[in-house]
Amino acid sequence: MSEVNVPLSFSDAAASRVKALIAEEENPALKLRVYITGGGCSGFQYGFTFDENVNDGDTTIENSGVTLVVDPMSLQYLIGGIVDYTEGLEGARFFVNNPNATTTCGCGASFSV
C-alpha cells in the first residue's frame, strides 16, 4: 500500500456519498475502489466497488475520513483525473473526469486513450 501525493483527486461530493454509503452498510472498514477494465463502446470502462482490502501496490487517496483505492494498472489511466459524484436527471452515479481520455461514450462510462 502506498499513500503518496498522486495527481488524482477524490472530490468532496464523492467522499460525502461514500461516507453515507459506508454508514448505511455499518462497516467502517469499507473503501471505494475505482478500477479500469477493457470493454464498453470506447475500449475501456470505469468500475467502482466497495472493498475492505488495500493490496500491495495500491494507491490510497483520503478525503473527509474515507478512502479511495486504486490499483497500479488502473492508476496509469487515471493520472490527473477527478473521481466525483453527481445526482441529476440521468440518476446518481460516481464518475471520473479524466483528462487522459481522447474519446468517451455518451454516458461517460467508457473511454479510449
Swiss-Prot record:
GO terms for molecular function: 2 iron, 2 sulfur cluster binding; 4 iron, 4 sulfur cluster binding; iron ion binding. GO terms for cellular component: cytosol. InterPro entries: FeS_biogenesis, FeS_cluster_insertion, FeS_cluster_insertion_CS, FeS_cluster_insertion_RrpA, HesB-like_dom_sf. Keywords: Iron, Iron-sulfur, Metal-binding. Pfam families: Fe-S_biosyn (PF01521). The keyword Metal-binding applies. Binds 1 iron-sulfur cluster per subunit. GO terms for biological process: iron-sulfur cluster assembly. Belongs to the HesB/IscA family. This is Iron-sulfur cluster insertion protein ErpA. It comes from Vibrio parahaemolyticus serotype O3:K6 (strain RIMD 2210633).
